[in-house]
Amino acid sequence: VERSNLQRQVVHGTADIGDLKVRSAAHTLTALNPDIHIETHEVRLDRSEQAEKLIANYDLVCDGSDNFGTRYLVNDACVALGKTLVSAAVQRFEGQLMTWKPGCACACYRCLFPEQGQTEEGMSCSEAGVFGAVTGVMGTLQATEALKELLGIGDSMAGRLMMWDALAMRFNMIRTHPDPTCPACGAAVVKG
C-alpha cells in the first residue's frame, strides 16, 4: 500500500502504508464482517501460466487492476479457461465496465484495447492519476454486474462497453464485437 493509493482505494488506510494490498484488504473486510471467508493470494501477476493457475479455481473474475499488463494477463487467462470476466477500469475522470463470457459472441478486453493505452497527453494510467470518487462508482457497478452474472438475473453487460464521464455526469453504452484477429479470442485461436 502506497500513500498515493489512499484517495482511490478506500479499503486501505494510513496505517496500512507499506503492507501488501492483499493483506490490508483482507484485514479491512474481515473487520467489517468477521463471518466471511477470504482466500488471499500474495502474488504479483506477471506471467500467463501464473494467472491461469490462479484463475482456474474460480467461476467469475472481477478485474480492477490499475495497469494494462495485468488486465491483459487476466483477460487472456479468463478467455483461455472459459471464465466469466467483469472488468472495470478508471483513468482521471472516466471509467469503463465490460463483461466477457464464454460462449458469447462478444469482444474480450484485448479486442477492445489491443495496445497498452495512454491518455491524450501521452501519460500512463499511474502518471495521469485517478479522481477517487470514480473508483467508487465503477467498483459499485462492477460488483452489481458480478452479482447479476452469478445469480443469472438482469441484462448482462457481455457484448457492451459502458463508459462513464464523471465531469459531464454522462454514461455511454456501445455494442462491441469480437476482433477475428484478436490473439486472445480470435478465430484462429478458437479453432486451435
Listing of model-derived features with the role each one plays in the protein:
Residues 1-192:
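Adenine nucleotide-associated cytosolic modules
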